[in-house]
């Protein structure tokens, strides 16, 4: 037996224990060597405009693994016409940005950040890995990273998506409004100017 149940919480126990099995909510598959690979959480699934559900973690990991500047990424789609992303830069990556572009205007920096953001799509480890519909069309830079202090990370350093949404849901909504590309670019330019002191 994995566990008897949650202490004094029959409702939560009933949701996860069925016929002596614990349903964790993790999504995964067995690889060719028979190892279980966990790829995400059922609760975190996004919904493409065609109704297809997909896990955001693989794309988020691909972006952070290939990006020179972005340390955290949360992608979003709930049957919207396209996927969007929120990105953060830790202190080291902000310093890297300042060092790389200390004499360059914010517009040029944003062009370079856009190229950097989309690097994963052509990277050999990820090329052709994700359907185009799942890949973020727009990204918005956030003024602070996700941390335990702002409750956007939990104690195991995992992103708390609903807390990010509580804080930045309005920003996400503007990424779907008319002139979303221009509005998101203006938002990003303001943050870039603050980071680079231009």
Task: Describe the role of every protein-language-model region.
Residues 27, 32, 67-91, 125-129:
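C-terminal boundary motif of the adenylate-forming
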Residues 57-65:
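Short amphipathic alpha-helix segments
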Residues 72-74, 81, 120-198:
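Conserved C-terminal "lid"/linker of ANL adenylate-forming enzymes
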Residues 53, 66-72, 93-142:
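Conserved C-terminal helical docking segment of ANL/AMP-forming enzymes
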Residues 1-48:
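Conserved ATP-binding/catalytic segment of the ANL
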């Amino acid at each position: 037996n994995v566990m008897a149940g949650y202490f004094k919480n029959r409702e939560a126990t009933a949701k996860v224990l069925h016929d002596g099995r614990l349903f964790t909510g993790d999504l995964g598959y067995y690889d060719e060597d028979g190892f279980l690979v966990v790829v995400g959480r059922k609760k975190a699934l996004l919904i493409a405009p065609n109704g297809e559900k997909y896990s955001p973690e693989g794309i988020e990991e691909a972006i952070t693994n290939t990006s020179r500047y972005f340390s955290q990424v949360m992608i979003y789609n709930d049957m919207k016409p396209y996927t969007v992303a929120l990105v953060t830069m830790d202190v080291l990556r902000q310093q890297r940005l300042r060092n790389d572009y200390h004499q360059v205007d914010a517009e040029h920096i944003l062009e370079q950040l856009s190229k950097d953001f989309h690097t994963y799509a052509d990277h050999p480890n990820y090329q052709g890995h994700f359907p185009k519909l799942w890949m973020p069309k727009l990204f918005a830079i956030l003024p602070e990273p996700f941390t335990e202090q702002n409750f956007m990370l939990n104690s195991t350093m995992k992103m708390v998506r609903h807390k990010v949404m509580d804080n930045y849901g309005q920003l996400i909504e503007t990424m779907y409004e008319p002139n979303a590309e221009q509005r998101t670019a203006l938002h990003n330019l303001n943050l870039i100017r603050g980071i680079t002191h231009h």
